[in-house]
Amino acid sequence: MGRRALDGPSVILEHSLTFFTIVNNLRLKLDRAAISLEDLAAKGPMKPEELRGFKDYDEYVKNEDITTINGLKKMPPRVGVREVPEETHYRTGWLLSEEMTKMMLDEAMKAKLLIHKSKVDQKVCLTKQMMMDEFDIIRGLIMMAYPAYYGLGEWEPIKVILENREEFDEKMDLTDDLPADKSSVWVCGKELQAEKFFYDYFGKNEKSKYVVKVQKRGSGAPQREPMIDE
């Protein structure tokens, strides 16, 4: 995870750990949202799971009720003024106007830049509020493009993300999300206990700066970071 100065030596580490994990998880979520927004803008809405990978899916559904596929998920209504080929056949290729597509792609890029690691070198502190504001912008843009999500299936990734319906299999551990109750703070190669204060380890010097890393418990010491320049 990125660097951040602690609020002071008297801060209890549990509070800092909660803050760090919230920022880390929001950053990852915003990255997923940016990618999903980009895919929707450039490739159109995602098909139902039953039709993904089908090249000529119109032939597949012509004898079916157009609103359902084998009695399962509903096909989203066609929304868009253009159609482009979609190589993976996971998405419909139905695109909105060039102006709306550009707005969506531009916003996806802004979101990526907001959370880019270059912000560390620029000494820009990424906050929860900054990311929540970006989510609000993306949500408003989606409502403008697809009012009330009309034209998008329940499985559309950006819709799932904005509605907080993402699910992860903890056994597979495929996500870098950090649950606060299963993570720990590391400083100078030392794992700090959440119930203690920072000064318990490093004293009460208010001017000291440390590189703090957070990762899941049991994964060992993180890689050492370079010294922070004044």
PLM ranges: what are they?
Residues 1-230:
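Ubiquitin system architectures
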